Structure formats: structure tokens, C-alpha cells
Amino acid sequence: VVCRQQGQVLSEGSALHRCAVWGSPVVHSLSPVLHRAAYAALGLTDWEYARRDVDEAAFPDAFAGLDGSWRGLSLTMPLKEVGLRAARTVTQLAAATGAANTLVRDADDPSAWTAHNTDVHGIRTALELAGCPAPSSLLVLGSGATARSALAAITSPPARVVFMVRDRVRPETLAQARAAGTAVEVVPMGRWEAVRDVDAVVSTVPPSSVIGLERLDRLDHASARTPHGPAVLDVVYGTGRTPLQRAAAEHGWPVAEGTDMLLHQATEQVRLMTGLPAPLAAMSEALRDALAQHATGRRRPSQTPDPAR
């Protein structure tokens, strides 16, 4: 087997190449399902993908203990910021968002790792599949690491973001918006009538935090780029549609699925870690099978506001 990582020959022969998802908790992570399906479809018989429960306190020692067989890590909460600091090289998107959900080992220098943010790709693709390929304005519920990835998904000027939060917007999230020249508005959680003219709604908070959905139709969407209202993405997945998604569908608004974000951020991770094009069809089928097993009670995937899990 010969693999290429970021254009370079990584290895050949039968040496084992290890990747994993780290975070806390990760017991119900679907990342192993997706990555293992990719390895099988690509014929990478000497690659393995595991999960490991690692919190912020344990991360430095765990990371320092990785031997030369390790090629990549998928990072979920609470490691997206500490993982960024561990990397020697940080990509533009990871730097802009202050969050990394992917660490990839350099093929030429085993001591060097690069931090990536593939959540942005996942969000952009999920919105595109819902008919909103180039949003210039977003309503973002929450202001944490995944919210910063949503902010980076704005691709069309003039950029504007409305944050809907219970308390206040995190300073690092405000700093990212201002550094990008994005106009910022802040409204309290549930004040849908205070939101005007957004192309898409992205929720990065637990479903129980979203209130006032009986007033969702008061959101002013006269100028939305999608003809039937703003595209609505809830990054939570695993137990069917969330109350926000159901309310949006009742109003005829296009709904983006959290599983689409999960799938497409994972395809980008596979590409970065192996250097090979990700087998989208095989990964999509594996995800559908895992969710179907959950629906029949045989396993429980994670429903989480952090889609790297």
C-alpha cells in the first residue's frame, strides 16, 4: 500500500497507520464508522481508526505519548482550542476560528502537526445542499467554537451575522467577526422577531436551549437568498429532526441536516489524513446504516452540538 499525504508519499508496506477521535465524551462517536468505511473503500488495510476519551487536562500527556504510527486526530469538545495550540502549523481557517477539529502529522517531520478546521467545510456543504450555497448573512445560535466555524462559512459580501445567545457573545467570537469585517448584531435567545433578513440559520446549541419556536415565523426573511425562507441547519444529529428543524419545515423553509455537516467534515478529514480523495458514497452509506441501527435501538449515536463527534 502506498499512500500520499498532502502530495507526499507517506509510507508503504505493512506498517500500521493510526488515527482516532479524541474528546470527552466520545463513547457514542460516529467518526469511527465514517473513517473505517473510508479505509475499507480505499483499500487501506493497514490503517485503523479508534476513539479515546481525553479531556483538556489529559491532552498534553496523551498527545506527547503518540508514537510514529499516528497520522491524524479528529478533535471534538473540549479539545478544539487546546489542539490548536499543540500544532506547529495552523491553517488559515483554523487560525481565523481559533478552533481545530483536525490534527494531521507532517509526512516529512514526525514532530510537526498541522491544525485544520473542517467544520467550516461541513457547514458550507450542508447549507449548499439545502439550497443556500453562498450565504452573506447568518443567524447563529450560540457563540462557541462551532459558532465560529459557522461565522467562517459566510462567503458572500457584505457579510453580516446575528448572534442569538442567552447571555453574551464570547469575546473571541466577536473578535473573529470584527477581524473579518463582518457586521455584528446580538439578540436574546428566542427573540426571533428581532432578526431581519438572514440567508441561513445555524444552531450550535443543544435543542433544549432553543426557545420561543412558536414565534419562529416572526423572523423577517423577505430578503433571504433562498426563495422559501432561510436555510436552517441544526448541527445536532442522531435522534431525528430537532424542534428547530421541525418548526422550520412547518413554515416551508429549507432544512439542512446535521448529518450532512458530520459527513462532509469527515470526508475532508479523510482527505487530509490519507492524502486520498474521500469515498463519499461509501461513507454516506455507512452513516445511514449506523443511524438506521440507532433507530431500531441497536446502538446510540451521539446527538451533540459539536459535529466532529
Question: Which residues make up each language-model segment?
Answer:
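Phosphate/diphosphate ligand-binding glycine-rich loop within oxidoreductases
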Residues: 12-130
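Phosphate-coordination loops involved in phosphoryl transfer and adenosine-cofactor binding
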Residues: 16, 134-137, 229
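Glycine-rich adenosine-cofactor-binding loop
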Residues: 23, 117-120, 127, 131-155, ...
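Conserved S-adenosyl-L-methionine
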Residues: 156-160, 251-253
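NAD(P)-binding Rossmann-fold cofactor-contacting core
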Residues: 158-180
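Rossmann-like adenosine-cofactor binding region
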Residues: 180-256
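Adenosine-phosphate binding glycine-rich loop
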Residues: 231, 235-309
